[in-house]
Amino acid sequence: MATNSTQETNKQLVQASFDHWGRGEGSPFDLLIPDVEWVIVGSSPLSKTYHSKQEFIDQVRIPFNARMAKPLVPTVHGIYADGDMVIVLFDLDAIGHDGLPYHNNYTWYLQMKDARVFKVIAFFDTQKFDEFWTRVRPKP
């Protein structure tokens, strides 16, 4: 169980990472350890457990971002900490290469140790995600 000061530090680190992401200066992915366990919950073909930062980035993040005409912009609605877990409620908005918007609601459960994220459980509307993934082809 994390101490109150560790809990608050973790929350502040995650808040700062989302602030940086919103300004295009970094992202929460910078907090991931190399062998992070990233779980996408749902029925999407991409819903599964990824066993490293690189696996997740190569199979999800890079091809997803390659479908965007402009970078994803997060809108954070709340960040909560309990023990070693930081929970983030946020939306992502962007425009795809087809000119149509992408919008989805996300909840990430970030489990932390030593100021780094070692496990993520991600919830979002996988149907919206899949529709976008299928509709928009990635650009190199």
Residue ranges and their predicted role:
Residues G26, K53-Q54, Q127:
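Residues in well-ordered alpha-helical elements
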Residues V14, S27-L32, V36, F56, ...:
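Hydrophobic pocket/interface hotspot
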Residues M1-L31, V136-P140:
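Short, low-complexity N-terminal intrinsically disordered segments enriched in polar/charged residues
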Residues T3-Q7, P45-K53, G99:
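Alpha-helix initiation/capping motif
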Residues Q12-W21, P45-Y50, P63-R67, L89-F90:
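Short, mixed-charge, low-aromatic patches
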